[in-house]
Curated annotation (Swiss-Prot):
It comes from Oenococcus oeni (strain ATCC BAA-331 / PSU-1). This is D-ribose pyranase. The active site is at residue 20. Its main location: cytoplasm. GO terms for biological process: D-ribose catabolic process. Its EC number is 5.4.99.62.
Amino acid sequence: MKKTTVINSEISSVIAGMGHMDWLGIGDAGMPVPLGTKKIDLALTKNLPSFIDVLKNVLTELEVQKIYLADEIKTKNPEQLQAIKQLMPNVEIEFVPHSELKKDLAKTHAFIRTGEMTAFSNIILESGVVF
């Protein structure tokens, strides 16, 4: 049995296959996923699992150099923005319109759907290197 924190086989496989500057998306239950994008659906019920819990778990195994967030999170969900910043205080943030973030999911290795039910709880993680 795997000893590390991420025990979901699909998530673990995606992370293991990522290289420098590859993208992984994590988001709320309502985020539309483009056709052809691998979707790992973890949603069980309203807010379970939460966006932040899934993000924390992924960050235990993925080196992140940059994140992409919707501009709208600044005014529509500032609490979530603050929680993200606390998890990654030294990671560059690029804000883009929500409509662009949705389109950019087509460039991700996968999108992890959570049960989160708060607006604009979506992120694209850009992988870094560990050396």
